[in-house]
Regions:
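Alpha-helical transmembrane segments of integral membrane proteins
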Residues: 1-161, 169
């Protein structure tokens, strides 16, 4: 519960700062994307754990699981054949929402100049570089990466809705 209170951007800033202090600049530039993925993943995993645990406890207490236990089905079979397929929907929904949030977090950090190095392509870096030209009449340098970022995040959320419907059927 405590880790859920720390925002992913703040956790990524903390991990990136630690990585910059512990390793050389060249190595950090080479490993920046992996550090960023690790930091965002560390900050988002409690949501997966909480949803998975809650869904598992709900499914475990249903009658068909009790009936399977009574007739002698092994715990491994119950887990993989009954419980796991039924908890996939909420986990898949949280996963695709987490993907959209991770994309936005990476873009935010790159926009702030903390994420990946400027030589690595990133939507946040493109938006930041175009921000200098925004009021000089060259608005498209910022506009198109920003629109693409919005469309990308929105498509992840649309996929969430579609994937939840597919798992349900």
């Amino acid at each position: 519960d405590v880790q859920l209170t720390v925002p992913s951007i703040l956790m990524a800033l903390l991990v990136d700062g630690l990585a910059r202090g512990l390793i050389s600049r060249e190595m950090h530039d080479e490993m920046a994307i992996y550090v960023l993925i690790f930091a965002i993943g560390i900050s988002e995993w409690p949501q997966f754990a909480r949803v998975s645990r809650a869904a598992t406890l709900v499914e475990k207490n249903k009658d068909y699981v009790s009936a399977s236990t009574i007739i002698g089905v092994s715990n491994i079979v119950i887990m993989f054949k009954h419980i796991l397929p039924n908890i996939m929907r909420p986990v898949l929904v949280i996963g695709t929402i987490g993907l959209a949030l991770a994309i936005l977090a990476e873009s935010t950090l790159s926009f702030l100049g903390v994420g990946v190095p400027p030589t690595t392509p990133s939507l946040g870096t493109l938006i930041r570089l175009g921000n200098d030209f925004l009021f000089s009449g060259e608005w498209w340098i910022t506009f198109f990466p920003a629109i693409f970022l919005v469309i990308l995040a929105f498509s992840c959320l649309l996929y969430t809705s579609d994937a939840a419907d597919d798992v349900r059927s």
